[in-house]
Every structure is written in structure tokens, then in C-alpha cells.
Amino acid sequence: MVTKKSKKAWPWLWLSVLVILLDQLSKYLANHFLSLGHPVKILPFLNFTLNYNTGAAFSFLGTENGWQIIFFAAISFVVSIFLILWLSRTSRSEIMMSLGLSLIIGGALGNFIDRLRWSYVTDFIDFHIKDWHFATFNVADSAICVGVFLLIVYMLLTPSSKP
């Protein structure tokens, strides 16, 4: 029996798995070598500061009584399924789209794992300029941001086939 080689972007899911592994490893290391709320200076503009986020980006809804954990876990899971289906219908030749989708999937599932295991997401990357600090984030958040950026660029640069 001869099988036809798939031209779909499924092989890009390896990148999602790599993002999940790097995210979970970095969070494991942060939890074992950092103390909650105590910054470790890496560069003049970068600290590693362990924080636990029960909300979403910028700790949105982080002070609620717990329902938000299930809510954000469900959103992460549903969005990941949707993006996996989108990736399954994407041509392997659409590299920027495949790369963006894979990064977002890996990031969303990395944070999903944290929410299921701990009821919070571990954040530790702390960029700052003097006393102004950006929201503390993690590898999964970075992958999501880069993935969204790539999708936006792809959509802006790719001519639409619609009239």
C-alpha cells in the first residue's frame, strides 16, 4: 500500500512540543532557584522574579475567588484545539503561518498545564527600565506574543484571494 505524503503543516507541532518543554523546564527551574517576590538581577534591565499569576495577562482577574482559573484554563484548551485544527488545514509551505500557530499552541498549552497542576501560572521574567517594570511573564507568554506577531505580519503581507 502506497501512502501519499501529507502536504499539511502537522510537522510544525514539534515546535509546540518544544515550547511546552522549554516553558515547563524554565518554570521548574524558577520555582526551585528563585524566592517568591525576590528579584535576581540578570542584566541592568532584566530580573528573574518569581510570581504566581491566578489571572491572565497583566494579572487580569487575578484577585477573583477562583472561577477565573477554570475560565482561563478552558479558554486555553479551546483556543489550542481551534489552532490545531487551523494548523491541520494549513499548507506546509505557509511557513510564517505555521510557525505562528505552533508558537501560540505551545504557549497556550504551557500555561494550561500550569493552571491544571497548580491553579496559577508561574511567571518570572521581569523587564524594567529603572523603577518601571513591565508585567512579569514566562516562556509560554513570549511564544504566544511572537506567534501572534507572526500571524499578523503574515496576514498583512499575504495577498487575499478574495475579490
Swiss-Prot record:
Pathways per UniProt: Protein modification; lipoprotein biosynthesis (signal peptide cleavage)
Annotated TM spans: 9-29, 42-62, 67-87, 93-113, 137-157
The reaction(s) this protein catalyses: Release of signal peptides from bacterial membrane prolipoproteins. Hydrolyzes -Xaa-Yaa-Zaa-|-(S,diacylglyceryl)Cys-, in which Xaa is hydrophobic (preferably Leu), and Yaa (Ala or Ser) and Zaa (Gly or Ala) have small, neutral side chains
GO biological process: proteolysis
Any one GO cellular component localisation term in the record: plasma membrane
Positions in coiled-coil regions: none
Membrane-protein topology: Multi-pass membrane protein
Keywords: Aspartyl protease, Cell inner membrane, Cell membrane, Hydrolase, Membrane, Protease, Transmembrane, Transmembrane helix
Record's subcellular location: Cell inner membrane
Domain of life per record: Bacteria
Record-linked Pfam families: Peptidase_A8
Catalytic residues (UniProt): D123, D141
MF (Gene Ontology): aspartic-type endopeptidase activity
EC number: 3.4.23.36
Record's function text: This protein specifically catalyzes the removal of signal peptides from prolipoproteins.
Family: Belongs to the peptidase A8 family.
Protein's UniProt name: Lipoprotein signal peptidase
Organism whose genome encodes this protein: Coxiella burnetii (strain Dugway 5J108-111)
Species classification: Bacteria, Pseudomonadati, Pseudomonadota, Gammaproteobacteria, Legionellales
Gene name of the record: lspA
